Amino acid sequence: RFMLRRARFKIDYLYSGDKMPIVFFALQVDATERGVVVRDMYGQLIDHKWKKISLFMGLFAKPFGFETNLSSGSRESPERGRMNQILFPRERDMGVMLNYHSLLNQGAWYDKIKVSVGLFNGSGLYTTSEQDNYKDIITRIQYLQLKLSPKLSLSAAASGYLGAIRSNNEQVYKFKNTGLSSTNETSNIGKRIDRKYYGADIQLKLKHAWGASEIRGEFIKGVQ
């Protein structure tokens, strides 16, 4: 059997004024024998005065954790880690996000801070319509490349995910000492089910004669 694991095509457009970016558009599709799926379709507006604040609108990756936003071109393996695949099987969603990150790195400590706050549908990449009125709030705060020595740098971040979905059936699943169990409760229909995640990640990078080596760690805890 022959098949295509990935066949992605991306186009983007950047409009600049006074040699600085102002507007950015991106469209990415994944076309395989199973069909064509839009993976990215968003616009980014960048403030022209301070060049620190930008607004994302459309379909794009959720700003939670390190590996969720690490593109396939930057990963050492074709797939993301198992933990990330379970919690975020479709790492993209429709929404709007406000981002703070200085485009003019003048060496100040605050130029290395990146803050993202987004509001998303929560229904994921492949859902054609919103399933409920709940929205997911996702935040991420990063400090990029703190110099520990001329060759050693440290990056760290914390993420938060506050969301919910609507239950459409009577089944309730719970983990107990004996394992996973389920019960039928009529009150569960239409009930709000919380999704709350909290995460932290760290990356230690060492430059050497052959390039650079990096150690990464990520921890996520929450309720699903």
Task: Please give the residue ranges for each predicted region.
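Outer membrane beta-barrel
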Residues: 1-125, 131-138, 142-149, 160-162
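Active-site-proximal beta-alpha loop/turn segments in soluble metabolic enzymes
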Residues: 118-128, 176-185
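Detector for outer-membrane/organellar transmembrane beta-barrel domains
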Residues: 151-224
